[in-house]
């Protein structure tokens, strides 16, 4: 029996051997017809090795050398609770109330009331949650660092999902480009976390952008995780040694902003992956007034080249930047 966000859940082991890196449990009666053995072997051999080779080993507080993965219903009515998985740090501390006393992550069985996740469709989420487990173990248990800012923690976890699948998260890119809710064109911030899909999309793009312009490529991710500050200064510290274009975090934000506007083949774009991260169609202009901008928020105003060339900003201050861009 496990403790979950829903309460106590009885579960049966469907995958795990003495040689495996993970143990998979599924809520009793919900095993279905899925081939859990094939999924477990695939995750063990491919995804687990990808995640741990990049981020390091997970903690092993229960001394069994394995990560426990529990698939259960997040709601008794099968209605999706809004997320596909989670990591709960209290599971690592046996004496905490509600702890499972195990290195584990929790996965949702149901996408909607009538639609069940297939195991293969959860690989990216499982990698995401495992990165949270590894990150917490390294920063909080091994080093006693402060917890990382949420937007960064989630951005690094989305990177784990990207490399678990070994491809770009196309749904995230499509969401950014279509901007169906008008978030991005109306000042949605990178750094202020709201806990909605737009947050994950924006921080995912940001961390892919910096990877593509870093000398060390994917190796910057563990470097950022292992930097003690755990905020934007961690990124600044790492990136200013990776590319002379980014002496400050402000420079990084500015160039990331322009990259999402013009899709260049240099620093103002996504480098040799600009086809995957295709930003060639400009975002829609800002559609609301009276926007409160937070760190990383952007507003787009389209006008004539003549107006752009003659524009002189006023009231700019130190925290708001005007960027004039001629796409021609």
Give the label of every model feature segment:
Residues 121, 148, 194, 198, ...:
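Short, solvent-exposed segments of well-ordered alpha helices
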Residues 230-328:
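Beta/coil-rich, acidic/histidine-enriched accessory regions frequently appended to metallopeptidases
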Residues 100, 120, 140-214, 225-260:
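Acidic/His/Gly-enriched intrinsically disordered linker/tail segments
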Residues 40, 48, 52, 127, ...:
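Non-transmembrane alpha-helical segments in soluble domains
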Residues 20-149, 156, 166-170:
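Juxtacatalytic substrate-recognition/specificity segment
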Residues 14-15, 21-26, 68-70, 104-108, ...:
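Ordered hydrophobic segments in well-structured contexts
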Residues 1-31:
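Acidic/polar low-complexity interaction segments
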């Amino acid at each position: 029996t496990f403790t979950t966000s829903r309460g106590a859940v009885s579960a049966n082991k469907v995958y795990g051997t003495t040689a495996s890196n993970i143990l998979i449990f599924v809520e009793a009666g919900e095993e279905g017809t899925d081939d859990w053995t094939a999924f477990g072997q695939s995750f063990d051999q491919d995804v687990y090795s990808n995640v741990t080779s990049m981020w390091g080993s997970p903690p092993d507080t229960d001394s069994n050398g394995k990560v426990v993965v529990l698939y259960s219903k997040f709601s008794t009515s099968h209605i999706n609770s809004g997320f596909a998985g989670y990591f709960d740090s209290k599971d690592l501390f046996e004496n905490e109330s509600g702890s499972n006393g195990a290195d584990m992550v929790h996965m949702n069985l149901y996408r909607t009331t009538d639609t069940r996740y297939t195991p293969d469709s959860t690989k990216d989420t499982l990698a995401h949650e495992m990165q949270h487990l590894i990150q917490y173990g390294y920063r909080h248990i091994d080093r006693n660092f402060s917890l990382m800012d949420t937007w960064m923690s989630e951005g690094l976890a989305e990177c784990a999902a990207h490399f678990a699948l070994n491809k770009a998260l196309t749904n995230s890119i499509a969401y950014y480009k279509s901007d169906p809710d008008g978030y991005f064109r109306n000042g949605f911030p990178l750094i202020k976390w709201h806990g909605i899909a737009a947050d994950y999309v924006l921080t995912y793009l940001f961390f892919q952008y910096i990877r593509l312009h870093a000398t060390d490529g994917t190796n910057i991710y563990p470097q950022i995780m292992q930097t003690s500050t755990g905020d934007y200064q961690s990124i600044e510290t790492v990136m200013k040694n990776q590319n002379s274009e980014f002496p400050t975090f402000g420079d990084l934000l500015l160039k990331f902003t322009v990259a999402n506007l013009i899709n260049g083949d240099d620093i103002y774009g996504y480098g040799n992956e600009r086809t995957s991260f295709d930003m060639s169609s400009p975002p829609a202009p800002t559609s609301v007034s009276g926007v409160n901008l937070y760190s990383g928020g952007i507003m787009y105003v389209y006008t004539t080249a003549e107006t752009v060339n003659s524009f002189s900003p006023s009231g700019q201050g130190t925290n708001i930047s005007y960027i004039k861009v001629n796409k021609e």
